[in-house]
């Protein structure tokens, strides 16, 4: 199968789905059996999955140590990985390993513990990234969260499952020109 044929077929392939498996470490994926869906994931002669989507959501991952190596063991063409779902884990940073997947177009990181808005800047090197989720992380509480993300990732067309509008783009552009930085929202203290 040529690389071009692979690209055309694997986009329509179901994801390699390790969601809801209580996975604690990325290395555990090598021995863990993926979930099965209505359509099974096809495999190459070497036994690797022919898909461009990897779902690791609803687990207990707190880092992505050895992510590249494990993905290379699981997927026939890891360089073509286009969709990674890491939502509802225990991640506190955006691991730079994610920026090595240049064909990544969908990245779900919602429902984690990412607390520094600057982490988003790491994703600017991904030329095909179009859909990103970050809601449900502590960074969502910062004023200007949406504008900051859109300012730093101008190619995004869907953010937090919501389409990016012209008004969103315009506001983000103003923020960029003015050099506005988001501010942490302080919790109100009850006065006795």
From Swiss-Prot:
Entries under Pfam families matching the protein: LRR_9
InterPro entries assigned: Leu-rich_rpt, LRR_dom_sf
LRR repeats: 49-71, 80-101, 103-124
Subcellular location: Cytoplasm
UniProt superkingdom: Eukaryota
Major localisation: cytoplasm
The protein, known as: Leucine-rich repeat-containing protein 51
Organism: Mus musculus (Mouse)
């Amino acid at each position: 199968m040529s690389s071009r044929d692979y690209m055309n077929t694997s986009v329509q392939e179901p994801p390699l789905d390790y969601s809801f498996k209580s996975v604690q470490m990325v290395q555990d994926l090598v021995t863990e059996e993926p979930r099965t869906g209505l359509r099974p994931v096809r495999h190459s002669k070497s036994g690797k999955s022919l898909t461009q989507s990897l779902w690791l959501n609803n687990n207990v991952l707190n880092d992505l140590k050895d992510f590249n190596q494990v993905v290379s063991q699981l997927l026939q063409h890891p360089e073509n990985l286009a969709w990674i779902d890491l939502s509802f884990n225990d991640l506190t940073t955006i691991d730079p390993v994610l920026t090595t997947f240049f064909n990544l177009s969908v990245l779900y990181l919602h429902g984690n513990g990412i607390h520094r808005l600057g982490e988003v800047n790491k994703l600017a090197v991904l030329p095909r990234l179009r859909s990103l989720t970050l809601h449900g992380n502590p960074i969502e509480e910062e004023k200007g969260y949406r504008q900051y993300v859109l300012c730093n990732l101008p190619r995004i067309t869907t953010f937090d499952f919501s389409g990016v509008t012209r008004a969103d783009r315009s506001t983000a552009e103003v923020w960029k020109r003015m050099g506005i930085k988001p501010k942490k929202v302080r919790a109100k203290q009850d006065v006795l």
